Every structure is written in C-alpha cells, then in structure tokens.
A protein has these predicted regions:
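A generic structural motif
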Residues: 166-170
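Extracytoplasmic/secreted cell-surface and envelope-processing proteins
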Residues: 74, 171-174
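Short, gly/Ser/Thr-rich active-site loops of penicillin-recognizing serine hydrolases
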Residues: 87-89, 94, 178-211
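Short amphipathic alpha-helical face segments that pack within enzyme cores
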Residues: 54-60, 174-181
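Beta-lactam-recognizing serine transpeptidase/beta-lactamase-like catalytic domain environment
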Residues: 1-165, 210-211
C-alpha cells in the first residue's frame, strides 16, 4: 500500500472529533481552547506533534472511554438552591454525544487500560480495580517532560474517571502516585488524615523519565 499522511490525519481528526476533542470541556471557568493535531500522523497518533489539551479536556475524554462512548460536558456544580433549599438549577449530567463504536472495541480498549494498571505496582496495590493509561508529554528538551495519567474505576462498572497532569513532573509515575491518593480518598482505602496531611507525599516519586 501507499502511506498517506494527509489521509491519516483526516482519519485521526474524524475520531478526535467523535470524542469532542475539538471542544472545550464545559467547565464554568475560563478554559483554553483545545488544539487538535494537524501534522505528522505517526507522531500525532501517539499524542505528540502539535496537539494540546487541558487536563479537564483529557478528563472528559477518559470519561467518554469509561462510559463506552457516552460523552458529557463537565461541570463544577451539583445544583443551585435558594436560602430555603429550593432547587433553582440542577446540573445533572446531560448526554452530549454517543460514539458509534462497537462494544467489542470498547472492551478491547478497557482491557488494555486494565492491563496498564495490573502491571503497575502502585495501581495494582489498590483494593479497587482501576484501569488507566500513563504518559509523558515532552515540550522542551531543556525542561523535564510533563507527567500524565488518565484512568477510571471500578473497572467492571466505572463510577469515577480522572486525568492527572504534573507540569514538568519528569515521570508519569509521579502522576500515578497522585491518582492513587485520589482513588484511595474516594473509596476510603486509606485514612483521610493521612491523605490530607498538608505535606507532600514523596512515596513512589521519581525524577527519572518514563514512557
């Protein structure tokens, strides 16, 4: 066959738009507009090239994966009430998109993300089944890469999804350590006072690049 970077970019763009990666996340605060990759399909397909997304946009992306294609806008609110407790506005999730992707494809993606977690010493130690993907984003050779993690839990019936980014954080392992604490807090896996101590947790942290 003949390789076509142009055709490859068209296909990549098609699927990125299906995931609404060309839209802001919906949060009620100022948010930088996403930038989808526009050149070099080989590098773009692994998240490099000129693509740029906020952490909240990555959070909506992994939420869509966790829900097998159901896409929602993010919000900072649950509801607005008056002084008497009457609900003035409800911020219950509204479906904004539904990807037409086969269930077997979602299962394959979920299984791959589960495999990442089971092979990770930190994530596999949790008493809740987690699925996720680690990554490092290289921006400048003169500075450390950004550490990233996206994931959801529980694996079989997802309830929460998250994205963690540590700017110039060296390693995705450092982002995983933050994610572990979030999962532990949500599912009461560790004492709250230990998790919210007000001091930095240096366990499992590294300045060695990974991924």
């Amino acid at each position: 066959g003949v390789f076509s970077d142009e055709q490859g970019m068209k296909t990549l763009t098609k699927y990125a738009e299906m995931f609404r990666m060309n839209e802001k996340s919906g949060l009620e605060i100022d948010e930088t507009a996403p930038q989808m990759a526009s050149v070099d399909v080989v590098r773009s397909s692994i998240g490099q090239s000129d693509a740029s997304y906020t952490t909240s946009q990555l959070a909506r992306y992994v939420t869509t994966i966790a829900s097998r294609g159901i896409s929602y806008d993010l919000t900072l609110f649950d509801k607005v009430t008056d002084a008497d407790g009457n609900v003035l506005k409800d911020y219950s999730p509204e479906v904004k998109g539904d990807l037409d992707v086969s269930d077997s494809t979602w299962s394959t993606v979920h299984e791959g993300m589960r495999g990442v977690a089971t092979r990770n010493a930190v994530l596999s130690s949790l008493n809740v089944a987690v699925a996720g993907k680690t990554g490092t984003a290289q921006e400048d050779l003169s500075r450390p890469s950004h550490g990233l993690f996206i994931g959801f839990a529980p694996y079989e019936d997802p309830e929460i999804a998250m994205a963690v980014r540590i700017t110039n954080g060296y390693s995705s392992g450092n982002a995983v350590s933050v994610a572990k604490d979030i999962f532990s807090y949500v599912y009461n896996l560790e004492d709250e006072s230990d998790l919210l101590s007000g001091t930095a947790n240096t366990d499992n942290l590294s300045n060695e690049p990974t991924d």
